[in-house]
Amino acid sequence: MSTEISAAAPRRAANGKKRANRRKKRRTQAESDSSDSSDSSESSQPSADEQEAKTDDVAVELSDVELSDSENKTVSHSEKLDDESKAKLKSIQLTATDLSSKFALQQNRNIDLQKAGREVDHGLEKLAKLDAQTSEQESGRLKTGYINMLFEHVGEDVNQLRNAPDFTPKSLVVLANALKDGGDMFDIESLRALVDNK
Protein backbone atom coordinates (compact mmCIF):
# COMPACT_ATOMS: atom_id res chain seq x y z
CA MET A 1 0.00 0.00 0.00
CA SER A 2 2.79 2.34 0.70
CA THR A 3 3.89 2.01 -2.88
CA GLU A 4 0.40 2.77 -4.03
CA ILE A 5 0.28 5.82 -1.81
CA SER A 6 3.63 7.03 -2.95
CA ALA A 7 2.66 6.52 -6.61
CA ALA A 8 -0.72 8.12 -6.11
CA ALA A 9 0.72 11.17 -4.40
CA PRO A 10 2.46 12.48 -7.51
CA ARG A 11 -0.67 11.84 -9.53
CA ARG A 12 -2.75 13.75 -7.06
CA ALA A 13 -0.25 16.56 -7.05
CA ALA A 14 -0.31 16.67 -10.84
CA ASN A 15 -4.10 16.49 -10.84
CA GLY A 16 -4.15 19.21 -8.17
CA LYS A 17 -2.07 21.47 -10.38
CA LYS A 18 -4.36 20.82 -13.31
CA ARG A 19 -7.36 21.61 -11.16
CA ALA A 20 -5.75 24.82 -9.92
CA ASN A 21 -4.98 25.82 -13.49
CA ARG A 22 -8.56 25.05 -14.51
CA ARG A 23 -9.85 27.16 -11.63
CA LYS A 24 -7.59 30.04 -12.64
CA LYS A 25 -8.74 29.74 -16.22
CA ARG A 26 -12.35 29.71 -15.09
CA ARG A 27 -11.76 32.77 -12.92
CA THR A 28 -10.00 34.56 -15.75
CA GLN A 29 -12.77 33.66 -18.17
CA ALA A 30 -15.41 34.63 -15.64
CA GLU A 31 -13.69 37.94 -15.00
CA SER A 32 -13.34 38.67 -18.71
CA ASP A 33 -16.96 37.66 -19.32
CA SER A 34 -18.11 39.84 -16.45
CA SER A 35 -15.93 42.71 -17.64
CA ASP A 36 -17.44 42.39 -21.14
CA SER A 37 -20.90 42.48 -19.71
CA SER A 38 -19.95 45.18 -17.23
CA ASP A 39 -18.52 47.37 -19.99
CA SER A 40 -22.01 48.09 -21.14
CA SER A 41 -23.19 48.62 -17.58
CA GLU A 42 -20.10 50.66 -16.62
CA SER A 43 -21.31 53.57 -18.65
CA SER A 44 -24.33 53.79 -16.39
CA GLN A 45 -22.70 52.79 -13.07
CA PRO A 46 -19.10 53.17 -11.88
CA SER A 47 -17.32 49.98 -10.82
CA ALA A 48 -16.43 49.21 -7.25
CA ASP A 49 -12.74 49.90 -7.95
CA GLU A 50 -13.53 53.35 -9.29
CA GLN A 51 -15.73 54.13 -6.30
CA GLU A 52 -12.97 52.97 -3.98
CA ALA A 53 -10.42 55.15 -5.81
CA LYS A 54 -12.72 58.16 -5.52
CA THR A 55 -13.14 57.49 -1.82
CA ASP A 56 -9.34 57.33 -1.46
CA ASP A 57 -8.99 60.64 -3.34
CA VAL A 58 -11.51 62.29 -1.04
CA ALA A 59 -9.70 60.87 1.97
CA VAL A 60 -6.40 62.20 0.65
CA GLU A 61 -7.89 65.64 0.06
CA LEU A 62 -9.32 65.73 3.57
CA SER A 63 -5.97 64.77 5.02
CA ASP A 64 -4.32 67.50 2.93
CA VAL A 65 -6.70 70.05 4.39
CA GLU A 66 -5.96 68.80 7.86
CA LEU A 67 -2.22 69.02 7.19
CA SER A 68 -2.59 72.55 5.92
CA ASP A 69 -4.44 73.58 9.06
CA SER A 70 -1.83 71.98 11.30
CA GLU A 71 0.95 73.61 9.30
CA ASN A 72 -0.70 77.00 9.69
CA LYS A 73 -0.95 76.48 13.43
CA THR A 74 2.73 75.67 13.72
CA VAL A 75 3.75 78.60 11.52
CA SER A 76 1.65 81.09 13.43
CA HIS A 77 2.90 79.65 16.71
CA SER A 78 6.56 79.88 15.67
CA GLU A 79 6.19 83.52 14.60
CA LYS A 80 5.55 84.63 18.17
CA LEU A 81 8.96 84.86 19.82
CA ASP A 82 9.64 86.58 23.08
CA ASP A 83 12.40 89.15 23.47
CA GLU A 84 14.73 86.68 25.19
CA SER A 85 14.51 84.23 22.29
CA LYS A 86 15.14 87.01 19.80
CA ALA A 87 18.21 88.13 21.74
CA LYS A 88 19.56 84.58 21.82
CA LEU A 89 19.00 84.18 18.09
CA LYS A 90 20.83 87.43 17.40
CA SER A 91 23.79 86.35 19.51
CA ILE A 92 24.38 83.20 17.41
CA GLN A 93 27.44 83.66 15.23
CA LEU A 94 26.93 82.42 11.70
CA THR A 95 29.59 81.42 9.24
CA ALA A 96 30.76 84.52 7.42
CA THR A 97 32.42 84.80 4.04
CA ASP A 98 33.45 87.88 2.12
CA LEU A 99 30.30 87.72 0.05
CA SER A 100 27.95 87.15 2.97
CA SER A 101 29.56 89.90 5.05
CA LYS A 102 29.17 92.41 2.20
CA PHE A 103 25.55 91.36 1.78
CA ALA A 104 24.94 91.68 5.53
CA LEU A 105 26.48 95.15 5.58
CA GLN A 106 24.16 96.24 2.81
CA GLN A 107 21.11 94.84 4.56
CA ASN A 108 22.00 96.31 7.94
CA ARG A 109 22.08 99.81 6.54
CA ASN A 110 18.73 101.38 7.19
CA ILE A 111 18.18 104.10 4.67
CA ASP A 112 16.31 107.12 5.93
CA LEU A 113 14.53 108.32 2.81
CA GLN A 114 13.58 111.66 4.34
CA LYS A 115 17.19 112.34 5.28
CA ALA A 116 18.32 111.33 1.79
CA GLY A 117 15.70 113.65 0.30
CA ARG A 118 16.93 116.53 2.45
CA GLU A 119 20.52 115.85 1.39
CA VAL A 120 19.49 115.80 -2.27
CA ASP A 121 17.62 119.09 -1.84
CA HIS A 122 20.63 120.61 -0.06
CA GLY A 123 22.89 119.43 -2.88
CA LEU A 124 20.56 120.94 -5.47
CA GLU A 125 20.61 124.25 -3.60
CA LYS A 126 24.42 124.16 -3.54
CA LEU A 127 24.51 123.43 -7.26
CA ALA A 128 22.08 126.27 -7.94
CA LYS A 129 24.27 128.65 -5.91
CA LEU A 130 27.42 127.46 -7.68
CA ASP A 131 25.65 127.76 -11.01
CA ALA A 132 24.52 131.27 -10.11
CA GLN A 133 28.05 132.20 -9.00
CA THR A 134 29.50 130.66 -12.13
CA SER A 135 27.00 132.45 -14.32
CA GLU A 136 27.71 135.72 -12.45
CA GLN A 137 31.45 135.21 -12.93
CA GLU A 138 30.87 134.28 -16.56
CA SER A 139 28.61 137.30 -16.97
CA GLY A 140 31.24 139.57 -15.38
CA ARG A 141 33.92 138.15 -17.65
CA LEU A 142 31.73 138.63 -20.72
CA LYS A 143 30.82 142.21 -19.73
CA THR A 144 34.48 143.07 -19.20
CA GLY A 145 35.26 141.56 -22.58
CA TYR A 146 32.42 143.63 -24.07
CA ILE A 147 33.86 146.85 -22.59
CA ASN A 148 37.32 145.99 -23.93
CA MET A 149 35.79 145.38 -27.34
CA LEU A 150 33.97 148.74 -27.16
CA PHE A 151 37.12 150.59 -26.11
CA GLU A 152 38.95 149.08 -29.06
CA HIS A 153 36.39 150.66 -31.37
CA VAL A 154 35.59 153.90 -29.51
CA GLY A 155 38.78 154.36 -27.48
CA GLU A 156 39.76 157.59 -29.28
CA ASP A 157 36.36 159.14 -28.52
CA VAL A 158 36.75 158.27 -24.82
CA ASN A 159 40.25 159.89 -24.83
CA GLN A 160 38.74 163.10 -26.25
CA LEU A 161 36.13 163.06 -23.44
CA ARG A 162 38.91 162.68 -20.87
CA ASN A 163 40.54 165.87 -22.20
CA ALA A 164 37.32 167.86 -21.81
CA PRO A 165 37.38 170.54 -19.02
CA ASP A 166 34.37 169.11 -17.10
CA PHE A 167 35.66 165.49 -17.17
CA THR A 168 36.78 164.07 -13.79
CA PRO A 169 38.23 160.68 -12.78
CA LYS A 170 34.82 159.88 -11.31
CA SER A 171 33.25 160.46 -14.73
CA LEU A 172 35.46 157.74 -16.21
CA VAL A 173 34.13 155.20 -13.66
CA VAL A 174 30.54 156.22 -14.42
CA LEU A 175 31.15 155.90 -18.16
CA ALA A 176 32.79 152.46 -17.73
CA ASN A 177 29.89 151.18 -15.59
CA ALA A 178 27.36 152.51 -18.11
CA LEU A 179 29.11 150.73 -20.95
CA LYS A 180 29.48 147.57 -18.86
CA ASP A 181 25.77 147.55 -17.99
CA GLY A 182 25.07 148.09 -21.68
CA GLY A 183 26.08 144.46 -22.05
CA ASP A 184 22.84 143.52 -20.24
CA MET A 185 20.88 144.29 -23.38
CA PHE A 186 22.28 140.99 -24.74
CA ASP A 187 21.50 137.55 -23.39
CA ILE A 188 24.45 135.47 -22.20
CA GLU A 189 24.73 133.44 -25.41
CA SER A 190 24.69 136.52 -27.67
CA LEU A 191 27.22 138.31 -25.46
CA ARG A 192 29.43 135.22 -25.47
CA ALA A 193 29.24 135.10 -29.27
CA LEU A 194 30.21 138.81 -29.51
CA VAL A 195 33.13 138.62 -27.10
CA ASP A 196 34.54 135.26 -28.14
CA ASN A 197 34.35 136.04 -31.87
CA LYS A 198 36.03 139.47 -31.87
From Swiss-Prot:
Subcellular location: Nucleus, Nucleolus
Feature: compositional bias, Basic and acidic residues: 70-84
Major localisation: nucleus
Pfam families per record: Rsa3
Any one cellular-component term (Gene Ontology): preribosome, large subunit precursor
Biased composition (Low complexity): 31-48
Regions of compositional bias (Basic residues) in chain numbering: 14-27
Cleavable signal peptide: none
Sections of the chain in a coiled coil: none
Cystine residue pairs: none
InterPro entries, sorted: Ribosome_Assembly_3 (IPR051898), Rsa3_C (IPR028217)
Keywords: Nucleus, Ribonucleoprotein, Ribosome biogenesis
Residues covered by region (Disordered): 1-84
GO biological process assignments: ribosomal large subunit assembly
Quaternary structure, from the entry: Associates with nucleolar pre-ribosomal particles.
Family: Belongs to the RSA3 family.
Role noted for this protein: Required for efficient biogenesis of the 60S ribosomal subunit.
Name of the protein described by the UniProt record: Ribosome assembly protein 3
Organism: Eremothecium gossypii (strain ATCC 10895 / CBS 109.51 / FGSC 9923 / NRRL Y-1056)
